[in-house]
Amino acid sequence: MIEPLLLGIVLGLIPVTLAGLFVAAYLQYKRGNDLGME
């Protein structure tokens, strides 16, 4: 049986991790465009 606390932590971290990766990729893409790099 999975502990509810552990399950809550995992379910909480997944969207945060995905959001962090998305923001990092967006900032890198935007910075690349600002520098004129394709």
Swiss-Prot record:
It comes from Picosynechococcus sp. (strain ATCC 27264 / PCC 7002 / PR-6). The gene is petG. The 4 large subunits of the cytochrome b6-f complex are cytochrome b6, subunit IV (17 kDa polypeptide, PetD), cytochrome f and the Rieske protein, while the 4 small subunits are PetG, PetL, PetM and PetN. The complex functions as a dimer. It holds the Pfam family PetG. Belongs to the PetG family. One of its GO terms (biological process) is cytochrome complex assembly. The chain crosses the membrane at residues 5-25. Its main location: membrane. Signal peptide: none annotated. It is a single-pass membrane protein. This is Cytochrome b6-f complex subunit 5. One of its GO terms (cellular component) is cytochrome b6f complex. It is found in: Cellular thylakoid membrane. GO terms for molecular function: electron transporter, transferring electrons within cytochrome b6/f complex of photosystem II activity. Keywords: Electron transport, Membrane, Photosynthesis, Thylakoid, Transmembrane, Transmembrane helix, Transport. Coiled coil: none annotated.
